[in-house]
Amino acid sequence: MSEILSRVWTVSHRVEIWLLILVAYLLQRNVNSGHLPTKAADPEAFMNVSEIIKHKGYPSEEYEVATEDGYILSVNRIPRGQTRLKKEGSRPVVLLQHGLLGDASNWISNLPNNSLGFILADAGFDVWMGNSRGNTWSRKHKTLSIDQDEFWAFSYDEMARFDLPAVINFILQKTGQKKVYYVGYSQGTTMGFIAFSTMPELAHKIKMYFALAPIATVKYARSPGTKFLLLPDMMIKVLFGRQEFLYQTRFFRQLFIYLCGQMILDQICSNIILLLGGFNTNNMNMSRANVYVAHTPAGTSVQNILHWSQAVNSGELRAFDWGSETKNQEKCNQPTPIRYKVRDMMVPTAMWTGGQDWLSNPDDVKTLLSEVTNLIYHKNIPEWAHVDFIWGLDAPQRVYNEIIHLMKQEPNLPQGTCRVKL
């Protein structure tokens, strides 16, 4: 066994070395050629979330929110839009939650008329954007250091159980409102399905749940990334350790910004961005590519990746399996992982799905649709893949305007299960 692990370790290092050699070759080739067209790096590639918001001419606020288990999360806010710069009293509150390896910048990476965060602010909403524990902006804890394994002992279980309640309660306390609209994307929807089905008191604080590229199960996911997740847990730990996964170091951030600034590498850059979720290249603004790669991947824990590995293998929405009945009993009060029941969620829910989405696969979506008790609206966009929901050029026309319409229609919707037409 030790010999096998040693070989895997050697292979992984060889892959890294060859990758660096390839990157160095591309860099040297581009620099020496001189005549290759180069795009100037967008200044937003070097900004944090608050700086991007201000750069676009919007008011920006940033807060730190402490969770019950000690993590300190960064939360960004756009309190009003460009057309409403004066304070005019309270506005309906919206919380946007990014997906796996994402951050709050995912909602503001495009131009203001193409980014959901800015569109909602201009439509009269008070916009808040979360950052899950372990990503670029949420790497603090009251007692733990990021150098400790204990800091990274979390998955989307804890994000649903601790992060969402902490952020939602903070927002309600800060704004004086009683309920929020929740918009989740990818893993952000997984957090919502778990939190709102297991914590009724939290679910009562949600006016309406908008699920973009929803993921409850990944039984039929066909992304190349899910093939990697079929590896045994031990193999994943050997390859990536026990702490953080795909945290973007300053070196690689600068490297990706440079590479995606080379016009000749546009196709390669777009392929890398789209590789995990499916291809719909013509629907992306590639002039923003260096902004995308400067902030994503934003990192998570290896344990979170292990949890997704377990989800791929089980085909179910379950709590993290800690590897022994004793540890599961300690963490979950039962010897086997809890199986979450989406049917227990009563929040009015609207969903948008993509026919070419490799992660939120249509077959998994079909199962999910049958389990959402209070589904008020569903729209499938046949040619859309995974990232279209946050970066697609036609996202405002095909999804965002419908979200705003439902939000403004919400006070007049009948209580209980209903269907709406747009």
UniProtKB/Swiss-Prot annotation:
It is found in: Secreted. GO terms for cellular component: extracellular region. GO terms for molecular function: hydrolase activity, acting on ester bonds. Its main location: secreted. Disulfide bonds join 260-269. InterPro entries: AB_hydrolase_1 (IPR000073), AB_hydrolase_fold (IPR029058), Lipase_euk (IPR025483). Glycans are attached at residue 48. It holds the Pfam family Abhydrolase_1. Its EC number is 3.1.1.-. The active site is at 186 (nucleophile), 357 (charge relay system), 386 (charge relay system). GO terms for biological process: lipid catabolic process. It comes from the Eukaryota. Residues 1-33 form the signal peptide. Keywords: Disulfide bond, Glycoprotein, Hydrolase, Lipid degradation, Lipid metabolism, Secreted, Signal. The keyword 4Fe-4S does not apply. Residues 92-392 form the AB hydrolase-1 domain. Belongs to the AB hydrolase superfamily. Lipase family. Plays a highly specific role in the last step of keratinocyte differentiation. May have an essential function in lipid metabolism of the most differentiated epidermal layers. This is Lipase member M. It comes from Mus musculus (Mouse).
